[in-house]
Amino acid sequence: MAEHQVNYASGLPVVLTSVDKLVQWGRSNSLWALSYGLACCAIEMMAAGGSRYDFDRFGTIFRASPRHSEVMIIAGTLCKKHAEFTRRLYDQMPDPKWVISMGSCANTGGMFNTYSTVQGVDRIIPVDIYVPGCAPRPESFQFALMILQKKIRKEKASRKIAPKRLV
């Protein structure tokens, strides 16, 4: 049987656990993703959106607008000229928001160790899940979404909003 926290601060017993679980369930099962494909990993992300992998069963819907997205999926090489635009897209997303870094180039800069390449998306925006590989298979991306769902279910409903960083 689940344990419930009872809050007597208002004078009446109020059960808080049920509301947290309901909000966590809703957030984890309706992930609206901003697909942000920058290189060859985007091809695998497009394949993941097809009927063979059926991401709809996880409640994942791909959106073109950051204002309608909770999850940003960065797939591919991020150049330094593009970093400010990426940060602006991240800032336009409503809270709470999560980021998945997909592929070796997004995770660490990949084989492009040059002056023009950002050596990891986490230098620009906070990343929640890293998907390794060059290019990672849609199954790996699917597994990353399942890990993100588990992470969301463990968070408090009243998650603190991180302060905005300047680029």
Curated annotation (Swiss-Prot):
Provenance organism: Campylobacter jejuni subsp. doylei (strain ATCC BAA-1458 / RM4099 / 269.97)
Residues holding [4Fe-4S] cluster: C40, C41, C105, C134
EC number from the UniProt entry: 7.1.1.-
Annotated protein name in UniProt: NADH-quinone oxidoreductase subunit B
Topological category with respect to the lipid bilayer: Peripheral membrane protein
Catalytic activity from the UniProt record: a quinone + NADH + 5 H(+)(in) = a quinol + NAD(+) + 4 H(+)(out)
Domain of life: Bacteria
Entry-linked SUPFAM superfamilies: HydA/Nqo6-like
Job description of the protein: NDH-1 shuttles electrons from NADH, via FMN and iron-sulfur (Fe-S) centers, to quinones in the respiratory chain. The immediate electron acceptor for the enzyme in this species is believed to be ubiquinone. Couples the redox reaction to proton translocation (for every two electrons transferred, four hydrogen ions are translocated across the cytoplasmic membrane), and thus conserves the redox energy in a proton gradient.
Family indicated by similarity: Belongs to the complex I 20 kDa subunit family.
GO terms of molecular function: 4 iron, 4 sulfur cluster binding; iron ion binding; NADH dehydrogenase (ubiquinone) activity; NADH:ubiquinone reductase (non-electrogenic) activity; quinone binding
HAMAP family: NDH1_NuoB
Cofactor binding mode and count: Binds 1 [4Fe-4S] cluster.
Needed cofactors: [4Fe-4S] cluster
Cellular location(s): Cell inner membrane
PANTHER family: NADH DEHYDROGENASE, NADH DEHYDROGENASE [UBIQUINONE] IRON-SULFUR PROTEIN 7, MITOCHONDRIAL
Self-association state and partner proteins as the record states: NDH-1 is composed of 14 different subunits. Subunits NuoB, C, D, E, F, and G constitute the peripheral sector of the complex.
Major site of localization recorded for this protein: membrane
UniProt GO cellular component terms: plasma membrane; respiratory chain complex I
Top-level enzyme category: translocase
